[in-house]
Amino acid sequence: MKVAILKYNAGNTQSVIYALERLGVEPIVTDDKDLLLSADKIIIPGVGEASSAMKYLKEKQLDKLITDFKQPTLGICLGLQLLCAHSEENNTTCLGVFDTKVKKFVSNVEKVPHVGWNTITELKSSLLEDLNENTFVYYVHSFYAEKSAYTVAQTDYAGVSYSAALHKNNFFAA
């Protein structure tokens, strides 16, 4: 199985590589169109900032390519943001796979960025079938994806209920 990790100068790529290697998968990290298209699965990892990530994807002409991927594609953290339509982070137009917006947490009560454990609920995807309702997941983020028709798991923080995971056709994001 060929797994490609999209290279676009985002952080957290090495953590994804280590996780895949522990599963016995040797991923390739690339922004080469042919290698991405020939991969069996694609991961868009990320810690970073939405506008600079989108700028890189456009410069490399990967923005249109990504939305046409046919193979299973997973966006993680910033990867989730990029797969949405728009991010409040520097008022960024994103890829639009998921017709939902990414908003910044605003709170006078809770800390932002949110760093900690939350439970996820309303699991609605076969990709989550091995998880139980109220499973704890760890977050480090200042932005969240609004709930939409593509929400397959949700959580809440700072009085906001939001998408913990999204799923549309071959695209999944968490």
Which residues fall in each region the model found?
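Extreme N-terminal starter segment of soluble prokaryotic enzymes
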Residues: 1-4
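Structural motif
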Residues: 43-45, 173
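Short hydrophobic segments within beta-strands
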Residues: 6-8
